[in-house]
Curated annotation (Swiss-Prot):
Gene3D superfamilies reported for this sequence: Ribonucleotide Reductase, subunit A
Protein name, as recorded: Uncharacterized protein MT0908
Lineage: Bacteria, Bacillati, Actinomycetota, Actinomycetes, Mycobacteriales
InterPro entries: AurF/CmlI, Ferritin-like_SF, RNR-like
GO annotation, cellular component aspect: plasma membrane
Alphabetical UniProt keywords: Cell membrane, Membrane, Transmembrane, Transmembrane helix
Main location: membrane
Amino acid sequence: MDRTRIVRRWRRNMDVADDAEYVEMLATLSEGSVRRNFNPYTDIDWESPEFAVTDNDPRWILPATDPLGRHPWYQAQSRERQIEIGMWRQANVAKVGLHFESILIRGLMNYTFWMPNGSPEYRYCLHESVEECNHTMMFQEMVNRVGADVPGLPRRLRWVSPLVPLVAGPLPVAFFIGVLAGEEPIDHTQKNVLREGKSLHPIMERVMSIHVAEEARHISFAHEYLRKRLPRLTRMQRFWIALYFPLTMRSLCNAIVVPPKAFWEEFDIPREVKKELFFGSPESRKWLCDMFADARMLAHDTGLMNPIARLVWRLCKIDGKPSRYRSEPQRQHLAAAPAA
């Protein structure tokens, strides 16, 4: 009897037709995917001379928004070394992105497999899957053009990646929290790079611009999906989800943002530099906290920021003020200039 009740509740949660506002939001996102979408081989002119990847191109030097790019150790390296490190780093970020999106695509396929006929979520999830497939092709083409043999995600996460998408069917709330934990750091980092206005290599600039434009829809869907489902959970489920939320955010952030072991060995980067970069200095800790301002807003708005959850956010070192609105730029307050 209990098992039957659980299955009925699970199926009932899949039906969203009674929520007109949510259905309208899904229609808007789906129409946006039809009107504005990108193809990696028609919207990026890979063979253009402008997109050629050449040695000693200073546009591959890491920007100041990258924690390594603003570190004194990196800035003390020769220009050639900075370029080499920058190319490897950016190629690995792209490889991490395609690994994560491959997991996301498989999870969305598992989730939509169980949807009832007529579900508006089905259409949008398929639109998102198509866009993510294009992103993986785009990221892999960038890696191939750069020519660095980068590993992407840490080995342990690559090993368990076939299992993660299986969560999406029976535990969709946990899965979509994981989706945000992967999408938010990448999106935050790329937006900061584009906002900085530094001269970037055309491949990197175009790939980032396309990814940020389409990822806005994907993150919006994940946020609205959770806003709808979280209030339906039982009190005990909400308690455990409130703890799972920050733990997942921090663990996936580490896997996505921190370069793999091969990077530190390849360029013989001192251990103390790594410790300071991730996340031992005040600047790097602020950068870490800023990534999850939108996630904290979601936790606040859905009642997941209880006293114990606040402690877990603090222990994970990703606590702080929530965003006032999604994608609010996180700016440093400038010190007032001394009077003349």
